[in-house]
């Protein structure tokens, strides 16, 4: 069976609580069945109380954290255009990074390209 799951607050909790993504109190379930595939989308939720600088910083911190956790857990972090082609055909566990709030842009149009770059090749935001 192929399974698609959207996590709206798991990534935020893991980052802000300094916990592991597979913490049993979260709803992340890894697929151990080689005949099925699981795609889990991790949205970075940004509270309305954050100012633009804090939201931008939390976005990049979350992107780095998700990449690290996917490496640790053996989850394939997919880039733009990959998820529909590969998630249910190649990988037992895959993930897609999303953002839930435009506040992460912090009023900087150049962040659109920076965010896309992270999604295209899973690079860190550091250059």
Language-model features: locations:
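N-terminal hydrophobic targeting/anchoring segments and the immediately downstream early-domain regions
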Residues: 1-126
């Amino acid at each position: 069976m192929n399974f698609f799951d959207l996590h709206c607050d798991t990534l935020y909790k893991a980052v802000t609580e300094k916990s592991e993504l597979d913490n049993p109190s979260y709803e992340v379930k890894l697929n151990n069945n080689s005949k099925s595939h699981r795609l889990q989308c991790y949205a970075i939720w940004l509270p309305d109380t954050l100012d633009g600088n804090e939201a931008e910083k939390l976005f990049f911190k979350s992107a780095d954290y998700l990449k690290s956790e996917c490496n640790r857990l053996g989850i394939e972090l997919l880039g733009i255009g990959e998820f529909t082609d590969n998630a249910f055909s190649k990988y037992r566990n895959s993930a897609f990074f999303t953002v839930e709030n435009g506040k992460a842009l912090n009023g900087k149009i150049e962040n659109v390209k920076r965010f896309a770059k992270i999604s295209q090749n899973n690079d860190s935001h550091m250059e």
